From Swiss-Prot:
<keyword id="KW-0964">Secreted</keyword>
<dbReference type="InterPro" id="IPR040597">
    <property type="entry name" value="HA70_C"/>
</dbReference>
<comment type="function">
    <text>The hemagglutinin (HA) component of the progenitor toxin protects the structural integrity of the neurotoxin; may increase internalization of the neurotoxin into the bloodstream of the host. Involved in binding to the small intestine through interactions with glycolipids and glycoproteins containing sialic acid moieties. Erythrocyte agglutination only occurs when the entire complex is assembled. This HA subunit probably connects toxin/NTNHA to HA-33 and HA-17, the other components of the HA complex, and it may also protect the M toxin from proteolysis upon secretion.</text>
</comment>
<dbReference type="Pfam" id="PF17993">
    <property type="entry name" value="HA70_C"/>
</dbReference>
<comment type="subunit">
    <text>Botulinum toxins are produced as large progenitor toxins of 12S (M toxin, about 280 kDa) and 16S (L toxin, about 650 kDa). M toxin consists of a non-toxic, non-hemagglutinin component (NTNHA) and the neurotoxin (BoNT/D). L toxin consists of the M toxin and the 3 hemagglutinin (HA) subcomponents of 70, 33, and 17 kDa. The stoichiometry of the whole complex has been modeled as one BoNT/D, one NTNHA, three HA-70, six HA-33 and three HA-17. HA-33 and HA-17 crystallize as a heterotrimer with two HA-33 and one HA-17.</text>
</comment>
<keyword id="KW-0843">Virulence</keyword>
<protein>
    <recommendedName>
        <fullName>Hemagglutinin component HA-70 type D</fullName>
    </recommendedName>
</protein>
<dbReference type="InterPro" id="IPR003897">
    <property type="entry name" value="Clenterotox"/>
</dbReference>
<dbReference type="Pfam" id="PF03505">
    <property type="entry name" value="Clenterotox"/>
</dbReference>
<dbReference type="GO" id="GO:0005576">
    <property type="term" value="C:extracellular region"/>
</dbReference>
<keyword id="KW-0348">Hemagglutinin</keyword>
Length: 623
């Protein structure tokens, strides 16, 4: 563009020149729906005879998605582009994706119909303000979609086409003035939304899971603020149908990535864990398509806005009730459509500051949590299905290191699983998606599935415990053994239970000791999820003679809970539970109960709040 045309454009621009802004430079979004005063924006017309339907449209590709710059002495093209893309939209990336749009309308039974198609643009400005006056303005027009003006005519009638050939740029929708001041000390740089290191918020309510890596699907329908993901807007006139179509080549769309720790959670590492958890096709070459269609009624015009959307995933390193590290991964999804009454071009323009950068979710909420095995930890295999009674000798080569043991069972049932001497505590997971998948000739064939679903277990290093779990034949399970010394344990013990201890299935039974003295005893355990159970096994001090007893009470503090007290007995069929008492409300309960000396009891609490459970036992006296 020649300098004379630039000067002519600048001097005749009738944009807003008086603003209530402090002195400085600003980047401004002036809205969508601009038609330029350039003949090559007119795409031609379509004529329909009486009663026929006319369809006009266009597919905008990279070669036709040309932005138009109007720089000034102070604001060159690079300065304009970088400031606009940093605040509002990465239109360079958007131009890689084709966008289709079309309009259709039926001619009246007694008239012909002429539809003329034009491109529309989103207008951005860089302005210099001095004493509430715009003293310099550079303009950028970024391709949006299009507009079809329809005119009904009688045979032989001359059509007034002045609307199409304008000497000034004009907005067929309501103009905007969304601004952000440009810092004087900052040099605009090329936008890079796809890989950022940020101070992510890692505060979160305690999760009902042990320490480890977790991938969370947070749902679909995420869009960036400030219309960064706007595809474009259609103005649809009365009795006209409009549609927006976008064929999506996923290998031309880029994810958005943020991390709190680029050393630990790089984009490559995060993508690998997402693939472990959900087998996500992050970069495939298949073409997806979405299309939105809307028809305006006979009494008003409407506008239809289309947006690109993202599906959000989080990778977290969860340690001791806190998120130590976090990465957010926004995977390109499809799109979203918003339809409203068409705004009036004569409506007042309001100066509005930009929103804070971020995301809004417009789709349904999700919170699907999947554990993934840390690739730095070892995996051992019990290659054949375990029988009803089985002892596994932990290889000495993996002692002193945390590891996972992959196994399956020969018979569906409820199993008691514990380490030798009930230490260290164990955690058991189901291998997600592994049912009947990697068994060959009754033998595990591989351990490539690294997605795991927590069943039960605890991280407490000094808590004696065992697992009661319901296991299904042909499903794969992992037991995680924490870092241990060779002097602590060298065996895992499996036993299928035939008694009614199966009522405790899929819970951890914490073994309590130090009840030899009177007074109050506190035990804190991280709870499983709401609706599940946490169990405690205690043996009453003293010799068993079926007569002597001690007085106890059971209560919780800061947590409400429903509990059941069982006596644990053993028979040839295994362990059995005898119900002693049901508690409807354990919060600050002080009701005493007499328990036999030397007998073993299990106290099971139903989790009604997600938190650490503080179980309190009051031992009073022998009776």
């Amino acid at each position: 563009m020649s300098l004379s045309i630039k000067e002519l454009y600048y001097t005749k621009d009738k944009s807003i020149n008086n603003v209530n802004l402090a002195d400085g430079n600003y980047v401004v979004n002036r809205g969508d729906g601009w038609i330029l005063s350039r003949q090559n924006q007119n795409l031609g017309g379509n004529i329909s005879n009486n009663g026929c339907t006319a369809i006009v449209g266009d597919l905008r590709i990279r070669e036709t998605a040309t932005p138009y710059y109007y720089p000034t002495a102070s604001f060159n093209e690079e300065y304009i582009r970088n400031n606009v893309q940093n605040v509002f939209a990465n239109f360079t990336e958007a131009s890689e994706i084709p966008i289709g749009f079309e309009f259709s309308k039926t001619a009246p039974s007694n008239k012909g119909l002429y539809m003329y198609l034009q491109y529309t643009y989103i207008r951005y400005e860089i302005i210099k303000v001095l004493r509430n006056t715009v003293i310099e303005r550079a303009v950028l027009y970024v391709p949006s979609l299009g507009y079809a003006k329809s005119i009904e005519f009688n045979s032989g009638e001359q059509i007034d086409k002045n609307f199409y050939f304008t000497s000034e740029d004009k907005c067929i929708l309501n103009e905007k003035f969304i601004y952000k001041k440009i810092a004087e000390t900052t040099t605009a740089k090329e936008s890079n939304d796809s890989n950022n290191t940020t101070n992510l918020n890692t505060s979160q309510t305690i999760l009902p899971y042990p320490n480890g890596l977790y991938v969370i699907n947070k749902g679909d329908g995420y869009m960036r603020t400030n219309d960064k993901d706007l595809i474009g807007t259609l103005l649809i006139e009365t009795n006209t149908s409009g549609s927006i179509i976008q064929p999506r080549l996923r290998n031309t769309t880029r994810p958005l990535f943020n991390t709190s720790n680029p050393t630990l959670f790089s984009q490559e590492y995060t993508e690998a864990r997402l693939n472990d958890a959900f087998n996500i096709q992050l970069f495939n070459t298949s073409t997806t398509l979405f299309k939105f269609v809307e028809e305006a009624p006979d009494n008003k015009n409407i506008s239809m806005k289309a947006y690109n959307t993202y599906e959000k995933y989080e990778l977290i390193n969860y340690q001791n009730g806190n998120i130590a590290d976090k990465a957010e991964y926004y995977l390109p999804s499809l799109g979203k459509c918003e339809v409203s009454d068409a705004p009036s071009p004569q409506a007042p323009v309001v100066e509005t500051p930009v929103e804070q950068d971020g995301f809004i979710q417009t789709g349904p909420n999700e919170n699907i949590i999947v554990g993934v095995i840390n690739p730095s930890e070892n995996i051992e295999e019990i290659s054949t299905p375990i029988p009803d009674d089985y002892t596994y000798n932990i290889p000495t080569s993996i002692q002193n290191n945390a590891c996972y043991v992959l196994f399956t069972v020969n018979t569906t049932g409820v199993y008691k699983i514990n380490a030798q001497n009930n230490l260290p505590p164990l955690i058991i997971y189901e291998s997600i998606g592994s049912d009947n998948m990697n068994i060959q000739s009754n033998t595990l064939s591989n351990n490539n599935i690294k997605a795991i679903n927590y069943i039960t277990g605890t991280d407490s290093s000094n808590a004696e415990s065992y697992l009661i779990v319901s296991l299904i034949k042909n499903k794969n399970y992992y037991i995680r053994i924490p870092q241990i010394s060779s002097s602590t344990t060298n065996q895992l013990i499996f036993k299928r239970e035939l008694g009614n201890i199966s009522d405790l299935a899929n819970s951890t039974v914490n073994i309590l000791d130090n009840l030899n003295t009177s007074g109050t005893h506190y035990y804190t355990r991280q709870s499983p999820d709401v609706g599940n159970y946490i169990s405690y096994q205690l043996t009453i001090p003293g010799d068993f003679n079926n007569i002597a007893s001690s007085i106890f009470s059971f209560r919780t503090r800061n947590n409400q809970g429903i509990g059941t007290l069982y006596r644990l007995t053993e028979s040839i069929n295994g362990y059995n539970l005898i119900t002693i008492k049901n508690y409807s409300d354990l919060l600050n309960n002080v009701e005493p109960i007499s328990l036999l000396n030397g007998a073993t009891y299990i106290f099971r609490v139903k989790v009604t709040e997600l938190n650490n459970y503080n179980i309190i036992f009051d031992a009073y006296r022998n009776s």
